[in-house]
From Swiss-Prot:
One of its GO terms (biological process) is symbiont entry into host cell. This is Cargo protein 2. Homododecamer. Localizes inside the capsid. The keyword Signal does not apply. Transmembrane segments: none annotated. GO terms for cellular component: virion component. Its main location: virion. The lineage of its organism: Viruses, Duplodnaviria, Heunggongvirae, Uroviricota, Caudoviricetes. It is found in: Virion. The keyword S-adenosyl-L-methionine does not apply. Keywords: Viral genome ejection through host cell envelope, Viral penetration into host cytoplasm, Virion, Virus entry into host cell. Protein that is stored in high quantity in the viral capsid and may play a role during ejection. It comes from Bacteroides phage crAss001 (Bacteroides phage PhiCrAss001).
């Protein structure tokens, strides 16, 4: 038996704590990574639970819900079974599915918001713009299946212009009325009229959609609305608004009218007495059970009327004596003094004052073709319309708190939904900047009244501590579904612009009756409610 010995120089070195901990740390780190990944996916996905509506977006909601449930199952498996190859693959699959299932929901939501902002911007540029549907009503399902989807739109102003152009061309071709006498302006003037085109009464019938209106005028409107494609939108309210805009263009069918004006002295004297009494006693205009007309006392109003009459008289003189246009007068340019006390640059020069004034008037009324007939008609129309514009119209509503309550609630609702309260500052008797939602309480003091100024629109007045603040009201704040008030105001503006003051006054009467009836009905309801409570 061999005799030998084995000597080992190895030394025992146990694993350090750090070395034994490394596998556990690696496991824990990967476990946490997967867990955090799933948590992050869950957090992102949960956002879309509030965006996708089960009723309006069933497909998007179902897709989100399935993803959310599968993600929860993966997290539960990780918690129970620990880190496995399946859990690693599960995270990869859920990331892939997030891109294909959740990201489209996110993109659809962003696209819808972009369309909402775009519509708001377009309407700020053109308040007459009509949409086949509000962008806010688009479902996420629609935008997921068709990301390029966009609501159709058409401008009401364009409709009116198209009808106006067609009506104007028609007026020159199809009608010619003989010269005749007629009384207008409530006997204020007698005028000789030669009319080429449609009479205002015929236009009014077509604008009001009277069955007896001219079929030719109705046909123009139908053609314009039909070519716009709005009928295919299947929205009766939008279609009615389109017809309203289109019919306004019919006023261009009123033919060219030449006037020879003879003042009715008896009427002038009686009217002057009434106006003098009204201004002296600050009395009101024609009394009514539902509204009162308050004469304006602004100097600017009197100045404007005087300017209009002076300009009309000048145009009539110029037409009677065209040679006036070439009359010259000499003017002196005093020059300017130098540092040595000597005037330089002075001298006599000639000008044509009548030609200069005519150019100023043409520019003022944008009569680029210089048509003297149209210019004279425009001045006469403005003078006639000033009789209506010189008054402010106030409904006889005693419960001012009801006015304030309705308008304030509607302004808040509109402001929360669209960031526009429908109220605007009254700046120098003009519609100014929009009033923000946070500032509307300044215009609702409990002591409120509303009025209508044909030059501005609807106005709400609020009085507190003896001080009054006023704001212009968007008709939408008190309007009905048919936009009756907006329609009345639009018709009044068109009629006054064309000098049809009698017809405009009728519309004002109708609108004030509507406003009075609306708030008076609320007052009666409130009174009945209070009686029952007692």
């Amino acid at each position: 038996m061999a005799n030998f010995s084995f000597v080992s120089g190895a030394k025992f070195r146990p694993f350090s704590y750090q070395e034994m901990l490394q596998p556990l740390q690696a496991y824990t780190q990967e476990y946490n990574t997967i867990q955090e990944g799933m948590g992050e996916l869950g957090t992102k996905a949960d956002v879309f639970e509030r965006m996708a509506n089960e009723q309006t977006d069933p497909q998007a909601y179902a897709m989100y819900k399935q993803y959310s449930n599968d993600l929860a199952a993966q997290a539960e498996s990780l918690a129970k079974q620990g880190l496995t190859p399946a859990s690693r693959q599960g995270l990869i699959d859920m990331k892939r599915r997030y891109s294909s299932e959740i990201v489209p929901i996110e993109q659809a939501y962003k696209r819808r918001q972009e369309l909402v902002d775009e519509q708001r911007k377009l309407q700020a540029q053109d308040s007459t713009l009509l949409f086949d549907r509000p962008a806010s009503t688009l479902s996420l399902d629609e935008l997921i299946s068709n990301p390029a989807l966009s609501p159709q739109s058409y401008s009401g102003a364009l409709l009116s212009k198209q009808v106006g152009t067609a009506a104007q061309n028609l007026a020159k071709e199809v009608r010619e009325n003989p010269r005749k006498w007629r009384t207008i302006l409530g006997n204020q003037y007698y005028e000789t009229i030669m009319q080429k085109g449609f009479r205002p009464e015929e236009i009014m019938q077509a604008v009001q959609n009277n069955p007896e209106a001219s079929p030719i005028l109705q046909g123009i409107v139908e053609d314009a609305v039909g070519s716009s494609g709005i009928r295919n939108w299947n929205d009766e309210n939008i279609l009615n608004r389109a017809y309203d805009y289109a019919r306004q263009g019919l006023w261009n069918a009123v033919g060219e009218t030449q006037y020879q004006t003879l003042s009715n002295k008896a009427y002038d004297y009686a009217m002057q007495e009434r106006l003098a009494a009204a201004k002296k006693g600050k009395t009101e205009g024609t009394p009514s059970a539902v509204f009162r007309s308050v004469p304006k006392t602004k100097v600017d109003g009197d100045k404007k009327t005087t300017e209009l009459n002076d300009e009309l008289q000048f145009i009539q003189q110029l037409r009677a004596n065209p040679s006036m246009i070439n009359e010259e007068v000499e003017r002196v340019n005093p020059g300017y003094p130098t540092q040595y006390g000597v005037n330089v640059g002075g001298g006599i020069y000639k000008v044509k004052p009548h030609a200069e004034r005519l150019q100023q008037i043409i520019k003022k009324y944008d009569m680029k073709d210089g048509n003297m007939d149209q210019l004279e008609q425009k001045l006469q129309a403005d003078i006639r319309s000033s009789a209506v514009r010189d008054f402010i119209y106030k409904p006889n509503i005693t419960q001012s708190d009801l006015i304030s309550q309705v308008i304030k609630e509607n302004a808040r609702t509109l402001g929360a939904a669209t960031e526009s309260t429908g109220l605007y500052e009254l700046d120098d008797n003009r519609k100014g900047d929009p009033i923000k939602l946070k500032n509307i309480s300044d215009y609702f003091t409990g002591d409120n009244d509303i009025s209508y100024d044909p030059e501005v629109g609807l106005i709400i007045n609020a009085t507190k501590d003896g001080k009054t603040k006023s704001a212009v009201i968007d008709p939408e704040l008190i309007d009905d579904a048919d936009r009756s008030v907006a329609g009345y105001m639009n018709n009044i503006n068109v009629l006054l612009e064309n000098g049809y003051d009698v017809e405009a006054q009728r519309y004002i009467n109708t609108m004030m009756n509507y406003i009075y009836g609306k708030f008076n009905t609320l007052a009666k309801r409130q009174s009945n409610t209070d009686s029952k409570l007692e």
